[in-house]
């Protein structure tokens, strides 16, 4: 969804993606804010780690994400690894409006996530074009309007931030 607000006289639109720890606090925010996230917080209830991250990227890569928030930068690296490994599957799911049936996702969660999925052949074609052009599409390619990346930058988390260098327009 979109989050619209006034900021110094300008209208701002944001799409949010949150990591797993951030997902816990995200569940407690008011409903009028929740509706503007890239996906339902029920995704964090998926017990299978690989299925959870697949779902996070599947639901996010389809959208024009402008803000990514996660406590631990390892989440960003994991999202990118998933995008590389499953890119073609994401494109297929987006084109068909599906969520990979091979994933170990409890049925009640799958039903909740799939209820809003619709075939999106236009976005699937855009993603295919990105893969043809860049071979390995990066966040700066599929989320060109990503403006904010909020994460920890202390201690050993710097190791993960270094892995993200060059994958976004700027790294600070």
Residue ranges: model-predicted function:
Residues 1-168:
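Active-site phosphate/ATP/adenylate-binding loop shared across adenylate-forming ligases
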Residues 170-172:
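Conserved small/polar residues in nucleotide/adenosyl-binding loops
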């Amino acid at each position: 969804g979109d989050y619209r607000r006034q900021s110094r006289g300008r209208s701002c639109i944001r799409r949010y993606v949150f990591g797993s720890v951030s997902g816990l606090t995200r569940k407690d925010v008011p409903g009028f804010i929740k509706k503007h996230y890239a996906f339902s917080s029920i995704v964090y209830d998926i017990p299978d780690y690989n299925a959870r991250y697949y779902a996070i990227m599947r639901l996010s890569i389809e959208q024009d994400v402008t803000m990514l928030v996660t406590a631990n930068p390892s989440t960003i690296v994991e999202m990118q690894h998933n995008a590389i490994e499953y890119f073609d599957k994401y494109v297929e799911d987006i084109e068909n409006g599906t969520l990979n049936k091979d994933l170990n996702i409890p049925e009640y969660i799958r039903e909740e996530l799939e209820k809003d999925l619709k075939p999106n052949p236009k976005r699937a074609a855009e993603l295919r074009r990105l893969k043809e052009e860049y071979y390995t599409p990066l966040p700066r390619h599929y989320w060109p309007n990503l403006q904010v990346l909020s994460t920890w930058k202390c201690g050993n988390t710097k190791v993960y931030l270094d892995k993200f260098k060059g994958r976004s327009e700027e790294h600070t």
